[in-house]
């Protein structure tokens, strides 16, 4: 694996996979800095942390998640301090550990009260380390302090109706998402509702029920996709519903979808809006106003939702992509003040108007006023500004060096983290005899 510097042509680093040298790693990403790289080896044998500045490597055995689609659920970096937390599994038991922000040595490791934990995450202020249990084990989210001590356990929503009296017997947490401001946590399960928890109290504050039939109101926008066939190809537009509509369900024609439908929830940059999708209605995006606990908008497409994400800095700007060959090279962008979702057709801007391989779409963290998208395929990429035609020219035409931050990840803004101000690196007084032998470290 090679590491190149975008500003220094003569820089090149080479990393060799010591665990499985003849096999490709399943997951690679940068760590807390540009000189730190995380890598999962094939078959989940090792989780490796490479330090390019010192040419040192630390290996952690038996990471619980190693496949590309789920590896990021198994580890987390604490905002501000850079402490590293990871889930491993040995002899059928979950083990969590917190590592030093510089040396990555174990500060504490313990066995959480889980049967089959499905992920962990820090809150943006770094005050809590969250872990959630498998859906098969019911509703359970653990709120741990930064040094790994259990503070509180959320055991599911309280039944609000008579028909929900056996709610605790159903499947539990399917998806857990923390808001950018750290004040709320959205919890999706196998029902048609989303629970929103207050982080400070670790208690449920609201429940968002997805209705089977949506009635248009002044406060609710319902946009339905329309596809027209022209000589130049398909044209995608959206019309606002004036009558009650039902979200399309899953296809029942016996065909197998390219990807299974997913239940997801994502907060916008202001933490005031929450976008959700459900397995039962895979082609619909729901947008909720958390201040009023009401539905703000419903976006109905003709194809299953592939992905959606809010702009990392600008509030209330949502990007959606859909499954299918007909949607390759198409991106839809919505905001509450627009006249329906905008269609960005970037396939026509690529060479030969073809998408090679898997289409890619992500936000750029641009310092200008207009939102900017990075679009492309496996060979070509382009930038697209969402500024109106009457506005100024494309923002990059007058840009200077260092005006653009090429990032599509989370905002890693330095935050105050008082919970670790008095963190004692010397944990010799803790009893870790039962779990220390589950970690294997190798320095090179």
Regions found by a protein language model. Name each.
Residues 1-444:
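Long, low-complexity intrinsically disordered regions enriched in Ser/Thr/Pro/Gly
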């Amino acid at each position: 694996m090679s590491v190149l510097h975008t500003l220094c042509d003569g820089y090149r680093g080479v990393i060799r996979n010591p665990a499985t040298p003849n096999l490709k790693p399943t997951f690679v990403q940068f760590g807390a800095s540009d000189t730190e790289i995380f890598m999962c080896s094939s078959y989940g044998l090792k989780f490796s942390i490479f330090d390019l500045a010192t040419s040192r490597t630390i290996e952690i055995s038996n990471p619980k998640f190693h496949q590309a689609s789920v590896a990021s659920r198994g580890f987390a970096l604490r905002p501000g301090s850079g402490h590293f937390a990871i889930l491993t599994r040995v002899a059928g038991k979950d083990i969590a550990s917190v590592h030093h922000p510089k040396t990555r040595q174990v500060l504490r490791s313990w066995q959480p009260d889980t049967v089959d934990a499905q992920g962990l995450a820090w809150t943006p202020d770094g005050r809590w380390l969250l872990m959630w249990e498998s859906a098969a084990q019911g509703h359970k989210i653990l709120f741990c302090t930064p040094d790994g001590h259990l503070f509180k356990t959320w055991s599911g929503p309280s039944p609000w109706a008579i028909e929900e009296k056996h709610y605790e017997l159903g499947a539990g947490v399917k998806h857990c998402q923390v808001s950018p401001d750290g004040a709320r946590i959205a919890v999706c399960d196998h029902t048609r509702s989303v629970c929103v928890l207050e982080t400070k109290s670790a208690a449920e504050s609201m429940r968002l029920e997805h209705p089977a039939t949506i009635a248009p109101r002044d406060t609710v926008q319902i946009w339905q996709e329309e596809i027209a066939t022209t000589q130049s190809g398909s044209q995608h537009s959206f019309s606002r519903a004036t009558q009650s509509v039902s979200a399309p369900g899953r296809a029942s024609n016996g065909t197998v979808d390219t990807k299974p439908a997913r239940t997801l929830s994502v907060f916008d940059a202001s933490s005031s809006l929450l976008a959700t999708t459900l397995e039962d209605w895979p082609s619909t995006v729901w947008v909720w106003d958390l201040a009023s606990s009401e539905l703000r908008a419903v976006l109905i497409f003709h194809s299953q939702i592939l992905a959606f994400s809010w702009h990392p800095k600008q509030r209330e700007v949502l990007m959606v992509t859909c499954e299918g060959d007909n949607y390759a090279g198409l991106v839809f962008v919505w905001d509450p003040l627009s006249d329906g979702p905008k269609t960005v057709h970037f396939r026509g801007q690529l060479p030969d108007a073809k998408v090679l391989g898997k289409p890619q779409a992500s936000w750029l963290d641009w310092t200008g006023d207009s939102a900017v998208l990075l679009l492309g395929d496996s060979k070509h990429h382009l930038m697209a500004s969402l500024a109106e035609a009457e506005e100024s020219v494309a923002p990059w035409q007058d840009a200077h060096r260092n005006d653009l931050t090429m990032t599509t990840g989370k905002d890693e803004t330095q935050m105050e983290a008082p919970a670790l101000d008095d963190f004692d690196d010397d944990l010799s007084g803790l009893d870790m005899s039962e779990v220390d032998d589950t970690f294997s470290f190798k320095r090179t």
